[in-house]
């Protein structure tokens, strides 16, 4: 599946290379491909190499829909399927600052027969809300994502 997503993104992105530096940064009916570039947990026993990839679709009615694949805090492959919305906060020079909130279903947390005794690993699949702050420059995006009370993550992305 990761190969399919990569090929899809590469083909779609190559078709729009000439438009990468357009001044319009909020493109309706567009996709955003993101990669997690840094993760930090307050507890060192948790995974800080999440290998996150996500693909989001931004509709004409300001809603976003997405899917993300990553290695969770317990080094297990996981998925997040979600919807959400962005909220403009401030524009400073050519940078746009936005708030973003997503809500969806996360799957892949397993307690491995009691090895990880947390509420989320007992359910394996659970609803979740994730807030983030975003900096946008033209079609390039950078997010700071809150990981509940466990830490934070930085992602970077390209809108096409």
Task: Describe these PLM feature segments.
Residues 35, 53-57, 67, 81-87, ...:
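Residues on the lipid-exposed face of transmembrane beta-strands in outer-membrane beta-barrel proteins
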Residues 16-29, 61-62, 88-99:
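Short loop/turn motifs that connect adjacent beta-strands in outer-membrane beta-barrel proteins
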Residues 9-12:
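N-terminal signal peptide c-region/cleavage motif recognized by signal peptidases
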Residues 1-3:
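Sec-dependent signal peptide recognition
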Residues 50, 60-62, 76-80, 94-100, ...:
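Short connector loops at helix/strand junctions that flank enzyme active sites
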Residues 46, 97-128:
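Outer-membrane beta-barrel translocator/channel fold
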Residues 40-49, 69-80, 123-125, 141-159:
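Solvent-exposed loop/turn segments connecting transmembrane beta-strands
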């Amino acid at each position: 599946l990761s190969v399919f997503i990569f090929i899809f993104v590469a083909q779609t992105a190559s078709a729009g290379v000439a438009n990468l530096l357009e001044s319009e940064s909020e493109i309706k009916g567009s996709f955003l491909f993101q990669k997690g570039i840094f993760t930090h947990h307050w507890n060192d026993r948790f995974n800080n190499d999440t290998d996150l990839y996500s693909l989001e679709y931004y509709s004409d009615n300001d809603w976003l829909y997405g899917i993300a694949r990553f290695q969770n805090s317990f080094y297990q492959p996981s998925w997040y399927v979600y919807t959400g919305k962005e909220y403009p906060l401030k524009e400073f020079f050519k940078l746009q600052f936005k708030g973003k909130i997503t809500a969806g279903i996360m799957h892949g947390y397993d307690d491995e027969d009691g090895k990880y005794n947390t509420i989320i690993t007992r359910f394996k699949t659970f609803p979740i809300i994730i807030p983030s702050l975003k900096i946008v420059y033209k079609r390039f995006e950078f997010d700071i994502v809150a990981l509940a009370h466990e830490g934070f993550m930085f992602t970077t992305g390209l809108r096409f």
